[in-house]
Amino acid sequence: MRFTRLSLSNFKCYADAAVSLDPGVTVIHGLNGSGKSSLLDACFFALYGTTALDTTLADAVTIGAETAEIDLHFEHAGGDYHVHRRIRASGGRAQTAACVLETPTDRIDGVTDVEAHISGLLRMDAEAFVNCAYVRQGEVNKLINAAPSTRQDMIDALLQLGKLEEYRQRAGDARLGVEDVKSNVEGQLDRLADQIADKEAADPHDRLASHNTALAEVTADIEHFEAEREQARQTRDDAADVLERYEESRTALADVEETIADVREAVAEAERERETLADRVSDHRERASDLDDEAAALAADLGLDDPDAEDASAERDAVADQREAVAERVREVAPAVSRLTEQADSAADDAATLDERAETLREEAAALDAEADDAAAKRDDAAARIEALDADIEAAMAAFDDAPVAFGAAEAFLDDATAERDELRERVATLRADRQSAADRVAEAEALLDEGKCPECGQPVEGAPHVERVTDDRERVAELDAELADVEDELDAVAQRVDRGESLVAAEDRVDDLEQQRERAVERRDEQADIADAKRDQAAEKRDRAADLDAEAEDARADAAAKRDAADEKRETLAALNADQTALKERLDALADLVDRLEAAADAREAAQRLAEKRAALAAQNEQRRDRLSELRERKRTLDSEFDADRIETARADKDRAEDYLEQVEPKLQALREDRDDLQAKIGAAENAIAELESLREEHERVQSRHQDLQAVHDEVTALETMYGELRAELRQQNVSKLERLLNETFELVYQNDSYARIELSGEYELTVYQKDGEPLEPAQLSGGERALFNLSLRTAVYRLLAEGIEGDAPLPPLILDEPTVFLDSGHVSQLVELVESMRRLGVEQIVVVSHDDELVAAADDVVRVAKDATSNRSRVSTPEHI
């Protein structure tokens, strides 16, 4: 596996960055704090998500940004892969908004699925990745400082031996689980055996036979007493029926006697009502005669000859029609009077209003003339302002007469000068840092030389191979001083160009501002000229309209006089119509009284006729009631003859005897039923006991069979647990031997020193370093640089072991070293270079080293330079340089 391309947007200190990574050794170079390690963090995060971050997810998003995106392209086993992650931050919190893995054959979405697929693809999770391929900054001594048990867990996990231990533990857990279940089953067998013995001792079969015999005897007694009870109930019901019919006859006789009394009372009441009706008929006939006399007098006053109600009503309707015609005429004339009066008043008001409007228009015309004069004055002021601005613009443009660029190009000129100045400033800072580093090495070397020691390895000067390095460093300091002076001179020249560009940009801004002011002055001049013309036109229109309104007012006054004359004529006509209407109303009221009296007389005669007919009907009803009395008296005699006293007494005696027997037999039956229920319950209990005994015997056989099965499973799981433990121990011993060999090869290759003979790795992953004289040393007793190289050797040995695999080659990610020189002096850095080159020779496809040390650059195939902008505090990445 190897990384091919990394793209970032708003990730940590990077706004936008993209870098391509080729096979071989790539050194990411830059000053401390420039953002080198953040590129590795991005690769690690792209593969394993938040597990790869030392901080929160929100800290991964650039300050001030809302989203961050990371795209990592890599090759693996001949296929191309692409991981895309997008983070969304809001209010101090962040979450993964998108996580996609594109494989050669599929597309996988979602954080969990993507990370699981990558872990399976590389055969390692995030922790294994750090322990194997990724030596993070400050963790170069992680493996060597770890306890042997921790180191064993790390390496076992990388070599997949942890899976065997996991399987062994699972088998052990399964064995314990089977033992628990088997113990429970054995206890269950004991309990079942005790229950079966208890059930057999109770002898449920004999108890069942005894209870069945007693139940048959009780059932026979119940059937005998129930038959006797039914016979007593029949006797009681027959006697009750006789007594009930007797009571019904007595009730019927009482009803007949009551009905006879009611009919007699009804006959007497009808006779009294007939006498009352005769008096009322006489009263109605007298009232009809009086009303006829009053109607004759009214007819004479009205000039009518013996009219009836129909004739009087027709005359009343004719007079009502005449009155309505006059009223209709009044309704027509009265509104006309009001309308003409209102029209006359309205015309007079219109004339006054028109006079007022004409006067207002003349006043408005005078005001518009004054506004037109004011606008003309403002127009003249704007014209003078335009002439002054033209002179100012010409003066400002004079700044470009001897300028290096034409008007309009000043801002581009300033941007180019500013960019060149920033690049030179960054170059000055880099040169000063390189010069300081070289000067420090010279000072340190000179101090060691003064003490008679080699500046590279600290050994005595005699026979030291690197003494000439001090002269090279002094020459390097002189070269850097000369180059720094040249660059500072260039920086001063560019600074003058920046100042000139800033003055030209200010001149362009001044011209733009003056031209905008001139445009506004032209607009104001034209606007005020238009206003003056418009105001004068409006004043002329208002004077013309005032003259028209004066003529309209005169016409309105003439119309008001004509309307008042017409209204006076209509008032005279209305007075004559009101007099006719009053006379017709008086005749109409008299006719209404005549009609009322004639109709009342007719109603009285009709009422007398109806009452006479009702009196005759009452007489007919009394005849019918007398016939009904005869029938009721015959029915009473029949009921009296049906009464038999002896039969009634016999029925009462039979009923009493039957009720006494029923009262005595019911408690006896209740007691027998309780005995029967008790026996049935005992029979059910005996049958249940027999069924439970059979069920317990069957359950005992089933549990016994399960116990045998569990014993077989227990034996199999125990054997499996033992097999996994033995296999893990055997494989670990093979790996320890192979890892020890690879570790010694690597350490001997990179640390060519006569002080140490070999390194020993025990089966528990304890490390021991043996000197040439055979004296053992703990790794912690080595110097800082030696410990760092020792640990790097161990890490690369583990990497080689994984690369070779237990059963052949295994695909591995790039070997990544983040600031591995942090614990190394200049001499050990050279040995680190040897280590990197040796891994290259051993066939590691891609090695990525992050460092600020210049010496590592010489060992690289490609160099990616990282720098940070001091103004924006953002890092940027240069295009890889092929060495």
Curated annotation (Swiss-Prot):
Membrane spanning stretches: none
Gene Ontology biological process: DNA repair; double-strand break repair
Cofactors demanded by this protein: Zn(2+)
Biased composition (Basic and acidic residues): 313-326
Disruption outcome: Mutants show a slight growth defect, but do not show increased sensitivity to ionizing radiation or alkylating agents. Show decreased rates of survival after UV-C irradiation.
Subunit annotation: Homodimer. Forms a heterotetramer composed of two Mre11 subunits and two Rad50 subunits.
Biological role: Part of the Rad50/Mre11 complex, which is involved in the early steps of DNA double-strand break (DSB) repair. Rad50 controls the balance between DNA end bridging and DNA resection via ATP-dependent structural rearrangements of the Rad50/Mre11 complex.
Record comment regarding domains: The two conserved Cys that bind zinc constitute the zinc-hook, which separates the large intramolecular coiled coil regions. The 2 Cys residues coordinate one molecule of zinc with the help of the 2 Cys residues of the zinc-hook of another Rad50 molecule, thereby forming a V-shaped homodimer.
Annotated protein name in UniProt: DNA double-strand break repair Rad50 ATPase
Annotated organism of origin: Halobacterium salinarum (strain ATCC 700922 / JCM 11081 / NRC-1) (Halobacterium halobium)
